[in-house]
Amino acid sequence: ARSIMREVQEGVSAFVEGLRFNIGLGVGDQVALMTFGGARFILVDWTGDLEQLKEGATKLRSRPATGAFLPDAVNDIAKDFAEREAARPVLVVVATDGIDYGSHHDYRRIVQDLRASYTLMYSVFIPTASRRLTLNWDSRERDALLSEGPRQTGGRRINLSGSQPVRDALISIQNELASQYVVTYHRPESPVPPQRLSLGVTRPNLTVRLTPRKPQ
């Protein structure tokens, strides 16, 4: 049988290892590892120590006696980023379709807070056989956040299917993070300032997403 938690552990470990070689954490760059089955729990607090993060990944466990509070956890992270004045905040959420017991926050407001803190959000969704039994209203709110958070911040949602490994999804996210470009431009003088900017690419089958850069 498929062990989802083992896959998540291996995927997060590979993601952390890739931070060393693919992205290269700079001085002051920090990563945290948190779970949200029930109240948010910090496995590894903000750190630049990748070995500590890899060890934390091995401690990821399912918490079957609790319900998920994903919207509240994402809301807390958005506040953390704002308070820390993070220069390049990125949030990667890995979630299954277990029961979500509700939230005190509307997903639309959470997405606004993510955008206000210039957070780039990705989500990896792992379906299970119990999905048809858990589509309550709160789960719909969670699903909306998993979709709209990435869409409105420049990330993307990855829905795993069949035996697709969690590791592959996380590595693909990491490759995108390592392939970002800063676009600068100068607009011509005009009595009416333009409201939109269009960016085109010539390479076929290439998708470009925008994440507004935090003002310096």
Q: Each PLM stretch: what is its role?
A:
Residues 1-216:
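Scaffold/interface architecture of coatomer-like assemblies
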